[in-house]
Amino acid sequence: MALPRPGGSRLQLWWLMAAMGLCATLPANSGEIILDDVHIYYSAFPSRLIPPGVAAAHDLTRAENLMMINISIKQGDQPIEADISGDVTNILGQARTIRFVPIVEQDALYYLGEVIVDEKDWLRFDLTIDSDSMSEPYELQFERRFY
């Protein structure tokens, strides 16, 4: 899989990682799955946490009603490439497909997907993560309530 290599400064990378790391400290919005020596990290955070310059550098949208879903996969301390697909379903049963975009800078690799949310929205995520480093695709399911 060929990955885009967007430009950007180290400061932009720092802000993006800080925004993702901030949300990783919130137990209700993040998680980790361990499959042998492969670790899958996932989190959800408001797109407004991404500084405007970082969002522009990576063609990301910032909006009050937009959440970012962040997936990263590592084998040891090395990021690994993956194909990620999936859907999000709200409490009314309305489903939407999430398109994940790889973000690559230096030694970091993240996959970000955008999800529009309504106030006090409850969402179920059904994602498939596939990588040559994994013996089989992993079905990741989690639920989040957004305020």
Give names to the regions the model predicted:
Residues E143-Y147:
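Short beta-strand edge segments in extracellular beta-sheet folds
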Residues L66, K120-R124:
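Extracellular Ig-like/FN3 beta-sandwich strand-entry sites
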Residues E105-L112:
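Aromatic sugar-binding surface patches on proteins
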Residues M1-R10:
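N-terminal secretory signal peptides that target proteins for export/translocation
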Residues S30-M68:
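Beta-strand-rich domain onsets/edges
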Residues R10-A24:
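Bacterial N-terminal signal peptides
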Residues V115-I116, F125-Y138:
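Short, exposed beta-strand-loop hairpins at the edges of beta-sheets
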Residues M68-K74, L112-E114:
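Short edge beta-strand/loop segments characteristic of extracellular beta-sandwich folds
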